[in-house]
């Protein structure tokens, strides 16, 4: 066999190995076995003497992008260990796209900080596809340059684990809102201490909170550019609503309520059996769907309402009022609702009066109805209107603010 045939066979073996490494799952412990295979290719092609005395030609070596892809399958600490294999491998791990960084893996917080500063150096241009970051209760100001690096390297998936006493750093919230390609955000809530998690993003496709207590408060605002519900979008909303169905306190904006209404036209809403408190903003045109939504909250105790003041809600015609009239009475009004509050000042418009009438006439458990009047409204005139409404509850107190 001449030298040309040997070379051809070696290159074929290298390409075959490269293909198998890309498409086949594998587990690696300790030293990266791809490095060993790289040496074996040459050893199998030439005699042992040649292998010992001849430097491996570049054409027999696996390319750096493939080696980096291999390192992406390793735990970060194992990928770092490959830096001792040779001079060539010394910095390869710095180009991995998937990273797991936990302060508990380091001997001290300073060691953790030093490593992060080194890896997230602003001059490095490699992309970060996925990052799992475990934080402790130290001052989080050190995260700012790291966050800048995340945005610069177009991070797509972020998993944050917060230990007891550690609050979500404000810089991470800025990352969510400023990173144009972030698609997945997961937060492990190890310890609930009344913390608030606010997420605002145009690119986020997945937001996961784990180990969250059922009495956590949810404030959700979801918007879609088009009210077109294909199978994928319907499935996503279904999973989201099912996931939050155990919360006890929820805030919903008008757009989110409209979204839920459109969803409920084709799929039955889940039961929010644990929810006792609801803060909701409504548009007058959506009032007729409100009782349908309340049917899914059978144990609601406290309700705070905000009516959106749009041109259409100010000028509802008698026919429009009839179309949005509310007839059905959900279970919560009959058995659990005790407190209703109109958060925005009311001035006697048809949608507002219709809701006031609805709660007073249909809820035997209602204890307090709180109303705010606009300055030009007189209390006496409004009281006269209220007196004409039959009350289902003999204990209901109407409060004017």
UniProtKB/Swiss-Prot annotation:
Checking InterPro entries in the record gives: F-box-like_dom_sf (IPR036047), F-box_AtFBL13-like (IPR053781), F-box_dom (IPR001810), FBD (IPR006566), FBL13/AtMIF1-like (IPR050232)
Tell me which SMART domains the record gives: FBD
What are the protein's UniProt keywords? Leucine-rich repeat, Repeat
Residues in LRR repeats: 128-152, 275-296
Keyword Transferase (UniProt): no
Spell out where the chain crosses the membrane. Answer: none
The FBD domain covers 321-373
**What Pfam families does the record point to?**
F-box, FBD
Ranges for domain F-box come to: 56-102
* UniProt name for this protein: Putative F-box/FBD/LRR-repeat protein At3g23955
